[in-house]
Amino acid sequence: MDPQARKNQPSLLRLICRARKTIRGSADDIGWLQHAPGMPPVEDGTKRFMELLESIRNGEHKLPNSMIYLLVPGLFSNHGPLYFVKTKMFFSKMGLACHVAKIHSEASVEKNAREIKECVEEIYWGSRKHVLLLGHSKGGVDAAAALSMYWSDLKDKVAGLVLVQSPYGGSPIASDILREGQLGDYVNLRKLMEILIRKVIKGDIQALEDLTYERRKDFLRKYQLPKELPVVSFHTEASIRPEVLATLSHVAHAELPIIPSLSARQPRKVPVVMPLSAAMAACAQLLQVRYGEKTDGLVTRRDAEVPGSVVVRPDRKLDHAWMVYSSLNDDPGEADASQVCEALLTLLIEVGQRQRHEISMKDG
């Protein structure tokens, strides 16, 4: 072999490796939990959820005041006080004790898990009531981590967990943005996603680091949710209709790179007023085109299903930021975030009651 060719061989191999990594992206990781050995199957609870939601919209409320309800916010907690506050007020008007966990979305999963554990203990010791947790987005991952890591301390204090649009298995957006060694046009695609997500979460892009497939696989190898814990998973997909992408509002802003003209050397940046819904729709469309996966703009439906959980798969188009902006523009013809949370927690209580009955039948 020519010496120069031999010298260039490692560089060529690295280039091939980078090209393969770029092209495949997250294709081999999406839905990995569904094929992982030893994972328990899920159960479809969509029909029962819809029945409970309809009853709630007709004024029938079943959540007991013998529990404390802890809401755990996720990546959009930086959008201010509207996030989960309306749901807390909604619960309070029904005479229910409801708290919102004070965690920072940009903190690591392990750090937030510790803080959630301490929050649950404080609530329990102050009330002597069991706690039901509902986490949205990364908040669901953080809450699940708390119960996985500290179950021996929390098993007599926690009655169940709901994960709403949570990337329990990981997120292709997180993995694709943070993956190194990408080439060509995919770098521009990555940059577009990064611009959208950075503006949407209003924080450090490293907040996504613990949500990459690599990080989630590492974590779940060490910690898994206890089998006796009642768990409900809820996931949706975003609407990517043209009118959603075209909608403008004041909620979030993005600077989108404009393709330079022939006479211009540098691409111009134009500030574009972009609502959360449009940013999520844009991300959902990118993921649909690249991977053929239905997502809420951040999380694929398959990655949001926790093994062994009762899964709710509504047909209604809801993106990942819906919990935030539903407080701003509720459609009276549809259930709002507070009602959805109530229905999910009611379903969780039913799941827990059924599990306890099954255990007692076995013991009997």
Predicted regions and their residues:
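Flexible, membrane-associating and regulatory peripheral segments of lipid-active enzymes
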Residues: 1-84, 89, 93-94, 353-364
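Short coil/turn segments at beta-strand junctions that form active-site/ligand-binding loops
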Residues: 67, 127-131, 229
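Glycine-rich His-Gly loop
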Residues: 72-75, 137, 166, 236
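Acidic-and-aromatic substrate-binding clefts and catalytic sites of carbohydrate-active enzymes
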Residues: 77-81, 104-111
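Short aromatic-enriched loop/helix-cap "lid" or pocket-rim segments at secondary-structure transitions
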Residues: 83, 170-177, 242-247
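Conserved alpha/beta-hydrolase
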Residues: 86-106, 162
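Serine-dependent carboxylesterase/thioesterase catalytic core
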Residues: 113-221, 296
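C-terminal catalytic-base region of ester-bond hydrolases, centering on the histidine
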Residues: 226-364
